[in-house]
A protein has these predicted regions:
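Catalytic, metal-anchored helix/loop core of enzyme active sites in primary metabolism
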Residues: 1-296
Length: 296
């Protein structure tokens, strides 16, 4: 059984991690739960999983109120060191970095130093400090959770690094794929939050609509896989999660129905593959379309 820390347990990826712990209670034990300020979610999860520790980054949260609402004998930290303290607890094997932004950077670095496995869903950490993090981490200590980078990781598994020619990330195009410049002038935030394939948090959904997310993912891929040869293609159905081209011009791709359940569970259990609720692909009722991105 593996002890889990969930940094960002109230978010979309955090909820997938908790679902994994629910589905496989013989595989995972929640050791620490951390949120920014969503204490309602934190309290609910604490009563369900009875962790050793809970942390809240927002120093404005009332410590005494939180203590009254939580089960007894749980360590509580509110404020600056909440995330770092979460990873430095006995019984921790895996740190799921599922928060957004750079707040978890120090906690991730500490976890690497302590020799913990990192299931990394936080792209901002790598964008801001990728060289430092990857130089500190051992091989396969960081397992990416982003669907695209998980796909690349899987495609490269067992391949010598000098076989790699380039990485090809796929992009759905977001909510506004196919819109004309005039149509884009009239779009609204509500429309931007309506992603055609993925159920994600608000920030990443907006970043997907503007294609900013893909820019961050390209930087993330360069750090994770130690290459500058990273391209992307528009693939509206999000069936191919990414591809790798090798020196012999062969291409290996990872395909699955769009769901974060697979990359989350893969990162937590690497290199096992446990059952999921993800819909099987029907190869007789699908087609794969790819488009070149517009040049600006």
């Amino acid at each position: 059984m593996k002890g889990l820390v969930v940094l960002g347990s109230s978010g979309t990826i955090g909820s997938y991690v908790l679902n994994a712990a629910r589905k496989y209670p013989d595989k995972f034990k929640i050791i620490s739960l951390c949120v920014n300020n969503n204490i309602k979610s934190l309290i609910s999860a604490a009563w369900e999983f009875y962790p050793k520790y809970v942390g809240v980054s927002d120093s404005n949260i009332d410590y005494q109120y939180l203590k009254q609402q939580l089960p007894k004998n749980i360590k509580i930290c509110v404020g600056k060191n909440a995330l770092e303290n979460a990873v430095n607890i006995e019984g921790v094997d895996i740190v799921a970095a599922a928060s957004s932004g750079t707040a978890s950077l120090n906690a991730v670095m500490l976890a690497i130093t302590l020799g913990k496995k990192i299931a990394l869903a936080n792209k901002e950490v790598l964008v801001s400090a990728g060289s430092i993090i990857m130089n500190a981490a051992k091989k396969n200590q960081i397992i990416p959770v982003d669907s695209e980078h998980s796909a690349v990781f899987q495609c490269l598994n067992g391949e010598p690094s000098n076989n790699l020619k380039r990485i090809i990330l796929t992009a759905s195009g977001g909510a506004f794929f196919g819109y004309t410049p005039n149509q884009l002038k009239e779009v609204t935030p509500i429309q931007a939050l309506n992603h055609p394939n993925w159920n994600m948090g608000k920030k990443i959904t907006i970043d997907s609509a503007t294609m900013m997310n893909k820019g961050l993912e390209i930087i993330e891929a360069k750090h994770l896989f130690h290459t500058d040869n990273v391209d992307y293609v528009i693939h509206p159905s999000s069936t191919v999660h990414s591809m790798v081209e090798f020196n012999d011009n062969s291409v290996v791709a990872q395909l699955a129905s769009p769901s974060m359940e697979i990359p989350v569970l893969y990162a937590l259990t690497y290199s096992d593959r446990l059952g999921t609720q993800v819909k099987e692909l029907n190869f007789f009722n699908m087609h794969l379309d790819f488009f070149a991105p517009d040049e600006i």
